[in-house]
Amino acid sequence: MKSEIQIHDRADLCRIEIEGTIGVPEEWQFETPDSRVATYERFRETLGRIARIESPEVIVEIRSTGGDVNDALLIHDALRALPGRITTRCYGYTASAATIIAQAASPGCREISANALYLIHNSICASEGNAAELAAKVELLRQTDARIAGLYAARSGRPVGEFEVLMAENNGNGRWLSPEEAVGLSLIHISE
């Protein structure tokens, strides 16, 4: 899967396509990475173009199995700062960090394809170091999990504990949610 953000804009609508692994440098994923975006740095450049469009409506199409949670949080916050109405649409396997970006939509504007699956899980990292360094990583993972569960709870209006339990299922690997389950949890508003 390519990783990029494409912008298709008109006076009344801006469409953004987010594809690929979030937070992995494009040069590591593709032979010709110039027009592809998977990192917040590249997204920020694109966001400058979006801000100049001043479109009253922005549609973000997400086709990603996730990636780096830090980049996803930064992209989420950048989208939330836009002045127009933001709609997020999830396709295929929308997983992990990609679900954080999906939560950036305006109220009532989070959508999912009828054939998609939506994965929420505890955060993961690869690490090495001594006992103190590893203990610090464990604490960071716990804080990250709490932050992500809090984001899902804030956007859905449901208790944070409900998301902590779902994310911790299967030894922290979480659960793939059907569109109906994602709508039932208010992570998504509309299944198409």
Segments from the language model and where they lie:
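N-terminal organellar transit peptides
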Residues: 1-97, 104-192
